[in-house]
């Protein structure tokens, strides 16, 4: 298949770029799920739900956005791409509005699709205006206690640091509230002008981060069996969103000129080992 051939070629490049990757790193993997965004309109409800649970009380990290549901202004498929759009507007007629002056969308596969281990790839073009905070990430399907339940950030970008892509894991032992989070970064100079493949290879032994087939960070399971250090042996779901402001995204302020801000996504694909 075309995708399988492309994956093999990509992984060969990644293996060359990151010596710790074996050339046959994905032997035995096959595509198990994808969204190619071929049908215009709202995102496919068989694949994506809207996370709006904290609108009334306010979102984490002192963020400024209201996450809307079923609103094409904030999430839609057009021209073969998923568009997530953050806008400068107040939706105060909605019953769960919490006083926010920006709108956006937070799409999740929670309750629909989740995976334990695999190779994850999202092809995206991201916004770069000051105050924007786009993210492609994963949480435990049955998360009740963050960070104990774990978090995998496939891609994060803050608009005041243009082109610097972050890949991070959060656990009880390793997280930003303690200053112990484990992550890496890579500069992608045209991240806001061109599409790139943001990738994670997650196995029982390691979580590896890459962009366009080039690996740049690895978090390894130390084998201790301590879930505070490695909570990554259970199903996780995907999340796509643009946050506005917040402790990190708004560290240098929020410029109204940054909005509307779009993250455009050409595909989301998941491969898993079949043996």
Model-derived features with residue positions:
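Bacterial N-terminal signal peptides that target proteins for export
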Residues: 1-7
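Sec/Tat signal peptide C-region and signal peptidase I cleavage site
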Residues: 18-22
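GH16 jelly-roll
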Residues: 23-275
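Bacterial N-terminal signal peptides
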Residues: 8-17
């Amino acid at each position: 298949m075309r995708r399988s051939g492309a994956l093999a070629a990509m992984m060969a490049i990644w293996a060359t770029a990151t010596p710790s990757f074996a050339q046959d790193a994905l032997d035995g993997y096959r595509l198990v799920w994808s969204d190619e965004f071929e049908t215009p309109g709202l995102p496919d409800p068989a694949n994506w739900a809207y996370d709006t649970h904290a609108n009334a009380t306010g979102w984490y990290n002192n963020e400024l956005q209201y996450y809307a549901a079923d609103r094409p202004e904030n999430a839609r498929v057009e021209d073969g791409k998923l568009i997530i759009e953050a806008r400068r507007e107040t939706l105060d007629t909605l019953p769960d509005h919490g006083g926010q002056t920006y709108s956006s969308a937070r799409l999740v596969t929670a309750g629909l699709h989740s995976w334990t281990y695999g190779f994850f790839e999202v092809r995206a073009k991201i916004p770069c205006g000051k105050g924007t905070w786009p993210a492609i990430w994963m949480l435990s399907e049955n998360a009740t206690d963050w960070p104990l339940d774990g978090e995998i950030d496939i891609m994060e970008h803050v608009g005041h640091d243009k082109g610097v892509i972050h890949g991070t894991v959060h656990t009880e032992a390793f997280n930003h509230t303690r200053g112990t989070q484990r992550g890496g970064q890579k500069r992608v100079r045209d991240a806001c002008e061109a599409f790139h493949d943001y990738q994670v290879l997650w196995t029982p032994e390691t979580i590896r981060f890459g962009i366009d087939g080039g690996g740049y960070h690895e978090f390894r399971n130390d084998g201790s069996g301590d879930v505070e250090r490695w909570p990554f042996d259970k199903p996780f779901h995907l999340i796509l969103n643009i946050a506005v402001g917040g402790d990190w995204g708004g560290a240098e302020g929020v410029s109204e000129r940054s909005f509307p801000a779009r993250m455009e996504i050409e595909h989301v694909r998941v491969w898993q080992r079949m043996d």
